[in-house]
């Protein structure tokens, strides 16, 4: 993506954001939208700060992710104003003055102290919708996070602009570069920690810059859904590798998962291939007007069909779903919205005026219950796992006969399988953001 084209896309993106903000402010009865970037937070009984995490509402407007004590101010009919904190400091590296393809579209004021922002903020704070954490308060400018404004903006965030899709594609490219390096490190016999370091080096981002903690799981560690321990010694023998890792680009996240078998001729590889084929079909079902809840239920049936074919369960997919057996093997949701945040907001929103669409009974970890519409980007991440705690529940609930325990014992040392792509819902066929990048040379 060239700089000029990003500039053009950003200009259009900003027009969309201002139109949304105009409507949100009208609904809430406010004259100004004020968004602090956030503040630094210090560890308890210490003078060391935590890694800074920018306010997602702030980085929706400008691609600044490491700028505490900065502000975005928008008043309908005017250009957005960015109050950019650039302190005098010899202890730390001072951020460069704003530059690049976005600055021509905003009015920028540079401040040297956090307090210097105050006279640049709207004087009548009661007329401001101020979106941020309480710690960002400055004088009378105290975040109020009005529901009418947040509900509208969060709901609309599901619909990505061409600019957002462009930078999300960049995040895909970075992450796939890391995934390739990670697979090579796995094939070379590296430890989880070594694989993680290979990933970070290939992406060019450290743990504080990545959108979430890398899941680098060898062998049975793949049965821990959010395994982040990073063992320093590679297990012997090396059987399997599950990697769930993304990258950041201009404030937007990617989220990709792959699973590999050490032995390409093993039954575990055959199981991976079956889940991979099913995952592609699930991604192709991302269509406008489809209920994501139904996609999730359909995923359960598809995965249980695979387990039945492999002799791991002894009952029909429908019976496994009805009795809760399927949840022991596939205990998480099919996916979620993604964008500025890995688990992007408003996945349960009934409308842009609030309300909530509940999860289906028996599926407490599904993160998206909305109808799919053009512009949404969702993850599709089916998984099959061999988790002792959940399989013990199957026995306790009287469904032991539904499972072939000898087959479970054969697959348990591999941990589990998860395969995840990002998919754009369009007016027609969906666009898979992830697969073409892996397929490229």
Swiss-Prot record:
GO terms for biological process: proteolysis. Mn(2+) 2 binds at residues 244, 255, 420. InterPro entries: Creatin/AminoP/Spt16_N (IPR029149), Creatinase/aminopeptidase-like (IPR036005), PepQ_N (IPR048819), Pept_M24 (IPR000994), Peptidase_M24B_aminopep-P_CS (IPR001131), X-Pro_dipept-like (IPR052433), X_Pro_dipept (IPR022846). One of its GO terms (cellular component) is cytosol. Binds 2 manganese ions per subunit. GO terms for molecular function: aminopeptidase activity; metal ion binding; metalloexopeptidase activity; phosphoric triester hydrolase activity; proline dipeptidase activity. Mn(2+) 1 binds at residues 255, 336, 381, 420. It comes from the Bacteria. The keyword Manganese applies. Its cofactor is Mn(2+). It catalyses: Xaa-L-Pro dipeptide + H2O = an L-alpha-amino acid + L-proline. Its EC number is 3.4.13.9. It is an enzyme of class 3 (hydrolase). Keywords: Dipeptidase, Hydrolase, Manganese, Metal-binding, Metalloprotease, Protease. Belongs to the peptidase M24B family. Bacterial-type prolidase subfamily. Splits dipeptides with a prolyl residue in the C-terminal position. PANTHER family: XAA-PRO AMINOPEPTIDASE 3, XAA-PRO DIPEPTIDASE. This is Xaa-Pro dipeptidase. The lineage of its organism: Bacteria, Pseudomonadati, Pseudomonadota, Gammaproteobacteria, Lysobacterales.
